[in-house]
A protein has these predicted regions:
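Extracytoplasmic/periplasmic ligand-binding sensor regions of membrane-associated signaling proteins
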Residues: 146-281
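Catalytic NTP-binding/metal-coordinating core of nucleotidyl cyclase/transferase enzymes
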Residues: 501-503, 521-543
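Extreme N-terminal signal-anchor transmembrane helix of membrane signaling/transducer proteins, especially
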Residues: 3, 7-42, 46, 50, ...
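Cytoplasm-proximal transmembrane signaling helix
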Residues: 18, 22, 397-402, 407-458, ...
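Intrinsic low-complexity, intrinsically disordered coil/linker regions enriched in small/polar
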Residues: 96-113, 208-219, 223-243, 285-391, ...
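Amphipathic coiled-coil signaling helices used for dimeric signal transmission
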Residues: 456, 469, 473-498, 504
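Short, charged helix-helix connector/hinge segments
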Residues: 449-469, 476, 515-517, 523-524
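Membrane-interface helix-start motif
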Residues: 42-44, 286-295, 388, 405-425
Length: 543
């Protein structure tokens, strides 16, 4: 016989009953808990996915509306007479500056400005390379040198340059700036843009609100000829529609020092386009919308959720929530997830993840193929997240929008339920143990009484009658036991009476001494008595 069944057979009924009750209760709680856990997890997952989908859809609508509003505003600006008059005045003033005198000391100051801001850095130890870079950026034409020495060097901060209307040099360009600078300054303020440019038909940047190092340069032949702005300029100039607004995705733009996207629209009457107006896409304003102005929890994204915008190059077009909240934690997490250290350091150096942080995830890959859906996968921070994704195609841009939240946070109620279930199970087991112990004692009590009664009968005491305390099988068994005990008692009494009768009969046939010898096993008995002599006696049927 196997050892386990043998051991189990030696366990008392009370212990077996206790084990059965305990096992039944634990299995019941486990089954109910497992069903509740799975059902709760599925319901919660669907609820979170639905929430993420709603947020993603709302953000997509926000982006599409923002781009529509921007393109509509661009058409209004460029079709208005102010833009036409302004580009004509700035172009004329720009051409007039070709022969303007730029003192050598001002030219040297401009060179030093470029060297100080665009020359050697800590990461660039090659001075020759730094000097070559500065030389490539330095103004080539006299108009550019004049404007930058008069405006770019005249203010210490970009904000001061924007506010500078007239330095008092008496030039036609400064007169145009004094007249129109306020108009374009209000444009960038209303649109939350960093800069607005006017570029004539030849590609000269004849005006800039920010008056940075792109002021006066030629966008087709100068140092920024390979920029996204140059591409947008060419497309806008070749457009047959004055209502055309060309949008170019984010790309590095050295004059601003940050990734910049452009909206460009032609200026001038049909058939006589004078140039274009270029507006830097208001990235800060878009990011405020994408980051809910820092109130992610109020938007329903908890402590770890966010929405991110990704381009076809798999680089971010928005700011990372973790980067904004804790740059050190951002660096640690993304590097651990596979982002190169130098990329994470570059994001921290620039103070932005736009066009720096790669997001090569399953959700982004599927959305770039035109799919919309939800899934659970790792994000760019290496965390398991629930993600809702979709493509966002607006104004000619091919972006991907992802709303996500960490699995740990999303399923926190399930984890709480699991902990509660475990604690409840432990409590139930304890209660069941106590209840089972009491029930087992009640259950085996009739068996104990029967056992004691059987021992009495075995000891020869047939005068046993057990109390019948129930009407169940134990009651029936007790009644049967009592009946058996009564029968045995009757048999014993009858047997005793029969023995007494036999004894009297034998005494009537023989003397008592002879009877005793016969009972002791003697068969041939001869003995002399005064009253009678027994010669032979053969008694059959008597014990």
């Amino acid at each position: 016989m196997p050892e386990t069944p043998r051991r189990f057979s030696r366990i008392s009924i009370q212990s077996k009953l206790l084990l059965m009750l305990l096992l039944t209760s634990v299995l019941s709680v486990a089954v109910v808990g497992a069903i509740g856990f799975q059902s709760g997890r599925e319901s919660l997952r669907e609820s979170v996915f639905e929430q993420l989908t709603l947020i993603r859809s709302a953000q997509a609508r926000m982006l599409e509306k923002a781009m529509r509003d921007l393109t509509s505003s661009m058409v209004v600006y460029t079709r208005g007479s102010t833009a036409e008059q302004a580009i004509a005045a700035f172009t004329a003033g720009y051409d007039e500056l070709r022969d303007a005198e730029v003192p050598p000391e001002r030219q040297q100051a401009l060179v030093e400005f470029y060297q100080r801001n665009y020359g050697e850095t800590d990461a660039d130890a090659d001075r020759d390379a730094a000097q070559a870079r500065v030389q490539a950026l330095l103004p080539r034409g006299n108009s550019q040198r004049y404007l930058q020495t008069t405006y770019t060097l005249a203010a210490d901060t970009p904000e001061d340059r924007i506010e500078l209307d007239d330095p008092g040099d008496g030039s036609a360009w400064s007169a145009a700036n004094a007249q129109y600078n306020e108009f374009f300054r209000q444009v960038i303020k209303r649109q939350h843009s960093a800069d607005a440019l006017l570029i004539d038909a030849r590609g000269n940047v004849v005006y800039s609100v920010g008056k940075g190092i792109d002021l006066g340069t030629n966008i087709q032949y100068g140092p920024y000829r390979g920029s996204n702005l140059a591409e947008a300029f060419k497309e806008a100039m070749n457009s047959n529609s004055l209502d055309e607004v060309v949008v170019r995705d984010f790309d590095t733009y050295q004059p601003s020092g940050i990734p910049t996207a452009w909206m460009v629209s032609p200026i001038g009457p049909a058939g006589n386009v004078q140039g274009v107006m270029a507006l830097a896409l208001p990235v800060d304003n878009l990011n405020r919308g994408l980051t809910f102005n820092g109130d992610w929890q109020g938007a329903g994204l908890g402590k770890t959720g966010e929405t991110i915008l990704v381009g076809p190059d798999l680089l971010m077009r928005s700011e990372s929530r973790l980067f904004l909240e804790d740059p050190d934690a951002y660096r640690s997490d993304v590097v651990a997830a596979g982002t190169p250290v130098e990329v994470a350091d570059e994001a921290i150096r620039q103070g932005s993840t736009i066009l720096v942080q790669p997001v090569d995830t399953d959700a982004v890959g599927q959305a770039l193929q035109g799919a919309t859906g939800t899934l659970i996968t790792e994000d760019y921070e290496g965390r398991r997240t629930l993600q809702a994704y979709s493509p966002v195609q607006t104004a000619g841009l091919n972006w991907v929008l992802v709303a996500k939240i960490d699995v740990a946070e999303a399923f926190a109620p399930v984890a709480t339920f699991t902990r509660t279930l475990v604690l409840s199970t432990v409590a139930i087991v304890l209660v069941v143990c106590i209840a089972a112990l009491l029930l087992a004692r009640v259950f085996v009590r009739p068996i104990r009484r029967l056992e004691a009664g059987a021992e009495q009968i075995g000891a020869g005491d047939f005068d046993v009658e057990l109390p019948v305390t129930s009407r169940d099988e134990f009651g029936d068994l007790t009644r049967a036991f009592n009946q058996m005990s009564s029968n045995l008692q009757t048999k014993e009494r009858q047997l005793t009476e029969q023995r007494a009768e036999n004894h009297r009969l034998l005494l009537s046939l023989m003397p008592e001494p002879v009877l005793e010898r016969y009972r002791d096993g003697e068969e041939n008995i001869a003995e002399e008595h005064q009253d009678v002599t027994v010669l032979f006696a053969n008694v059959d049927g008597l014990d």
